[in-house]
């Protein structure tokens, strides 16, 4: 009579917040690769080490400026958008106004009521 032993190993996906945080850091440190017509398909980074480059993000086209209106990519820009001055999220004035400044608009809503005095 023999005995049988099982061992099970598995990988668990990390929390989405952790993954997104790592990706954001990599995005902010991404390296621009200047491509040209003489490109042979071989990339020789001068300042980057091969091991580091394998774990980092690289890009060869600059992102469009989403602050300004661009009809080619159907981007309306952010001018005239309402921002939240107390927010630290995507709707914050720092993100939406793109350094152009913003105006503070105070509004007092008026509603009809059937009040009698």
UniProtKB/Swiss-Prot annotation:
Glycosylation sites: 84
Modified how: Palmitoleoylation is required for efficient binding to frizzled receptors. Depalmitoleoylation leads to Wnt signaling pathway inhibition.
Positions of disulphide bridges: 83-98
Gene Ontology cellular-component annotations: extracellular space
Keyword Lipoprotein in record: yes
Lineage: superkingdom: Eukaryota
Family: Belongs to the Wnt family.
The name this protein goes by in its record: Protein Wnt-10b
Organism: Plethodon jordani (Red-cheeked salamander)
């Amino acid at each position: 009579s023999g005995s049988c032993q099982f061992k099970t190993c598995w990988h668990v996906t990390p929390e989405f917040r952790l993954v997104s945080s790592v990706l954001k850091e990599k995005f902010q440190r991404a390296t621009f690769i200047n491509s040209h017509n003489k490109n042979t398909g071989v990339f020789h980074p001068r300042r980057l080490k091969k091991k580091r480059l394998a774990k980092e993000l690289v890009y060869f086209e600059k992102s469009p400026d989403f602050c300004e209106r661009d009809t080619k990519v159907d981007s309306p820009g952010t001018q005239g958008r309402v921002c939240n001055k107390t927010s630290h999220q995507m709707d914050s004035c720092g993100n939406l106004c793109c350094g152009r400044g913003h105006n503070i608009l105070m509004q007092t809503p008026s509603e009809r009521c059937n009040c009698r005095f």
